[in-house]
Amino acid sequence: MIELDGQAGGGQLLRTALALSLCTGEAFAMTGIRAQRQRPGLLRQHLTAVEAARAVGDAIVDGANTGSTSLRFVPKGIRGGNHRWAIGTAGSTTLVLQTVLPALWMHGAEGSLTIEGGTHNPQAPTADFIDEAFLPLMKRMGLDGDFSMGGHGFYPAGGGEITFELRAGARPSALHLPHRGEVNERHARAILSAIPLGIAQRELDVVRRRLGLGEDEISVRQVKPPTGPGNALSIRVRAEHSTAVFTGFGIKRVTAEHVAEGASKAAQAWLAADVAVDEHLADQLLLPMALAGEGSFSTTLPSDHARSNAALIEKFLPVEFAFRDEGRGRWLVEVSR
């Protein structure tokens, strides 16, 4: 059994361990889960990920309780079929999906995965990011399936839903992304739920000015019926070899202009950098590339989160990661056996 210290990371460290355990069949025990957070231990959204992993892996689990700082997870085998999980809060649906999808894909399983909760959460990849940036690359690596969103879920109400219909396909294959190629599309979309339309107009005015977008490169999506008040601004930049999605979230006492400025600056920084993958997508590519046993991509300065995830992956899989500084803000991340 692999012994893990969860003090250095948050819930993502646990979710990555669950995903790796399912993929490899290796049991693990983690202590100190979220020990340095204001509310230590497992919260409801983490428990949903544990329950999803337990169901998919037919696993024996000890310590899956609210507030628990230790967990023991022993997978027995991968089970496809139809699964549905409800987080019950605005906790991220996409993080639960990413916990169980790699193992089902790797083991050639088929099934339907539906998760209810938050789809646009400031602390997690949005449903738009998964659909437009992450999954297209996974399909190039061999993933076969369809993603859909049955409803938007914003913090704090939640109420959203995502579904992934998985078909048995090829195991993960190597992907190399040294360059992004020419940018061929830019689009900004303001998403509103029970929020005045003027908020979207103010956000998009900033994006148009910052990024030089035309009228045909902006849109507004009003969620009907609304599941609760919420607002997100999603900027998509599609290039020849990769797509980046940058998101700003409307929150209390933060102006629409400030939300749009932050997302626009992130998009501008990526456009100015000579890299294929933005920082957030870089975090998401480590596990699937490790499962393929080979891969590489160029990105900006790797986050501490990416490095800690790479170190965790190396505990479960016979791979090594290399982070190479190529100068001028460009890094090359490589994984090999």
List each language-model region with its residue ranges.
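N-terminal basic/disordered segments at the start of proteins
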Residues: 1-26
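Glycine-rich phosphate/pyrophosphate-binding loops
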Residues: 24-41, 110-113, 149
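A generic, well-ordered mixed alpha/beta core segment in the N-terminal half of proteins
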Residues: 47-64, 68-146, 163
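Flexible, glycine/charged-enriched surface loops at secondary-structure junctions
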Residues: 60-64, 110-111, 144-152, 211-228, ...
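Phosphate/diphosphate-binding glycine-rich loops and adjacent basic-rich segments that engage nucleotide
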Residues: 74, 78-80, 86-90, 106, ...
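Beta-rich nucleic-acid/ligand-interaction surfaces
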Residues: 122-125, 149-163, 221-230
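Conserved mixed alpha/beta catalytic, RNA-binding, or beta-rich assembly cores of soluble enzyme
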Residues: 123, 140, 179-279, 296
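C-terminal functional modules
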Residues: 298-337
